[in-house]
Regions:
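Active-site beta->alpha loop and helix N-cap motifs at the rims of alpha/beta catalytic domains
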Residues: 1-14, 19-22, 27-103, 135
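Catalytic alpha/beta core domains of metabolic enzymes, predominantly
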Residues: 91-94, 107-156
Length: 156
């Protein structure tokens, strides 16, 4: 099991790191936008604080497989190839995950925007290392987010 902070607030990250056994940080475009700063400026500050050995998950913003793969190249160029790229599980994202896995077998891939166990299954088959279900959003849609996450966990 790993503990990841889902935040881009460097002060919050710095406050939590000495208290809890944190394995890394996840971000997304909405979290980064709340900082009011340039995304890569924030991400580089996070990377510098947590170190190269800790996990940093950064989401692509492209809408096509080609655009997502361009985002991956940019993320790796700015933050290092050890950075996990978060790719949404939609048709373009599944294509991007497969192409990235084939081109870079050692790439670190987190499948995101997952609402169902089938999406997680498809992401794993495509080559994702992690599946990140949207538990709160699943709950907001009237389903049970925790139960969905348990099903996904049991599948693997």
């Amino acid at each position: 099991m790993k503990i990841l902070i889902d935040d881009a607030n460097i002060d919050a990250i710095k406050a939590l790191y000495p208290v809890y056994p944190i394995d890394g940080v996840t971000t997304n475009p909405s979290i980064l936008a709340k900082s009011g700063r340039q995304p890569y400026e924030v991400l580089k500050e996070i990377r510098a604080f947590i170190g190269a050995e800790a996990e940093l998950h950064v989401q692509v913003v492209g809408r096509t497989a080609d655009a997502m793969l361009e985002d991956v190249e940019c993320i790796h160029a700015e933050l290092g190839a050890q950075t996990y790229t978060k790719i949404p599980v939609n048709p373009a994202g599944l294509e991007a995950i497969q192409r990235l896995r084939k081109a870079q077998p050692d790439a670190h891939i987190t499948a995101t925007a997952i609402y169902t166990p089938m999406q997680a299954f498809l992401a794993a088959k495509a080559g994702a290392d992690y599946a990140a279900p949207y538990i709160n959003r699943i709950d907001n849609l009237g389903a049970d987010g925790i139960a969905t996450a348990k099903i996904i966990q049991d599948m693997f």
